[in-house]
Amino acid sequence: MKLKPIEVAEILQKEIANINCLSELEEVGQVITVGDGIAQIYGLANVKSGEVVEFKSGVKGLVLNLENDSVGVVIMGDDNQVQQGDNVKRTKEVLEVPVGKALLGRVVDALGNPIDGKGDIASKEYRHIEMKAPGIIERTSVSEPVQTGIKAIDSLIPIGRGQRELIIGDRQTGKTAIAVDTIINQKQAHSLTNESDKIYCIYVAIGQKRSSVAQIVKKLEDAGAMDYTLIVSATASEAAALQFIAPYSACSMGEYFRDNGMHALIIYDDLSKHAVAYRQISLLLRRPPGREAYPGDVFYLHSRLLERAAKMSEEKGSGSLTALPIIETQAGDVSAYIPTNVISITDGQIFLESELFYKGVRPAVNVGISVSRVGSAAQIKAMKQVAGSVKLELAQFRELESFSQFGSDLDPATKAQIDHGKRLVEILKQAQYNPFPVEEQIVSIYVGTKKYLNDVPLQKVKEFEDKMLTEIRLNKKDILESIKNEQCITEETEQKLKAFLENFVKEFVK
């Protein structure tokens, strides 16, 4: 059968119309040099700083340096997969990470990809990792407490929702232990139905050993705390670029809770290693070094991160993001570059001392140097009632203790004050992974400040406290309930507590 020319033309027109031949315009450059996690790229004239680019192998990179004839890119992954001469294309996107409640209970990398082998994360919402910090009008002052469950902190260095409180100390002094205890202590609030009491937790491991991160995950799972916790891990074996962006990614995940009227707590463990990763990147990009070879913008690196922690105003939903950055010092030197930077950015610091740690005072908090600049406004009235004098008494005790080393002839009043100070130090000691509810902390500190321990031998103070709290939980629950509900110690409650303690001390000393 012969086709007429007009029919052939119609068939061709139909076929041409069905061809899906959409041409896409891509901006492509070439890798000039690559090494140490950094690639120099030629040909991407319109690329922007902070933009994501994609290499031929599928590995992503982040543009950090814009030069006259080339672009400096940090490689977010294995740089062995990037070769000289490879093509690189623009994505015209900035870095985004998944956010939302679907991430809770999971361990993710710095880009939000799951690394715990529990399958994909069903998150529908994404956020940029670099977000502008809330302005002054959008914020309100800190007024609600974050209970850490640690007596020495909740009584003397209270933390409020929306605060930035630095945990600083030498290696192996219990910095991470304080952070993990704080996460575990939120379990009680999560057992309640009231959303405003709950605090969702995010732990960011920067430059840590993988074994340490695995240990923390195991501990949180055993304590039942992973249900409301998310872990972002950028371990020491990963690219410096991933260690550099991990805190920003985690902060965006925390901001989801803050901006939706919920409360979140984020722990950066630790920002010393974060600064080292950024120094490595900056030096490889040939940026001019400054003090201790850190780049000039290392202050801005941390300030733009920590300023994102805030307590939002009622119009913005009253949510909050509380930050607990951790800094590791060398031989107790808090006057080094990074420690002084972060101290000046944060609203206070908890200073841990190795000397106290080795003496068996744990948590090894140095009460004299530690301070909370805004937390006292968030402290509940009951805690203020009992802990008001503790800081002064401990400071006087430390002074008298160092003075008493020079002479043994002390008058009875000084001796009594030193004995009282020793018992206060003893009552503030606490085992790891054993956070206390705030009402039990108040009773313990009341016992210490009101000198009920004066007749108890020093080595038996811990035993006294354990037995006393067990007894009060079993037979005097109304005292604890009253403190918890009223948020203060009423006259009636105080009378009951005094009567109970007088009897208990007599029985115990027998």
UniProtKB/Swiss-Prot annotation:
It is found in: Cell inner membrane. F-type ATPases have 2 components, CF(1) - the catalytic core - and CF(0) - the membrane proton channel. CF(1) has five subunits: alpha(3), beta(3), gamma(1), delta(1), epsilon(1). CF(0) has three main subunits: a(1), b(2) and c(9-12). The alpha and beta chains form an alternating ring which encloses part of the gamma chain. CF(1) is attached to CF(0) by a central stalk formed by the gamma and epsilon chains, while a peripheral stalk is formed by the delta and b chains. Disulfide bonds: none annotated. HAMAP family: ATP_synth_alpha_bact (MF_01346). Its EC number is 7.1.2.2. It holds the Pfam family ATP-synt_ab. Its main location: membrane. Belongs to the ATPase alpha/beta chains family. One of its GO terms (molecular function) is ADP binding. The record marks 370 as: Required for activity. It is a peripheral membrane protein. Produces ATP from ADP in the presence of a proton gradient across the membrane. The alpha chain is a regulatory subunit. This is ATP synthase subunit alpha. Gene3D superfamilies: 2.40.30.20, ATP synthase alpha/beta chain, C-terminal domain (1.20.150.20), P-loop containing nucleotide triphosphate hydrolases (3.40.50.300). Keywords: ATP synthesis, ATP-binding, Cell inner membrane, Cell membrane, CF(1), Hydrogen ion transport, Ion transport, Membrane, Nucleotide-binding, Translocase, Transport. It comes from Rickettsia rickettsii (strain Sheila Smith). It catalyses: ATP + H2O + 4 H(+)(in) = ADP + phosphate + 5 H(+)(out).
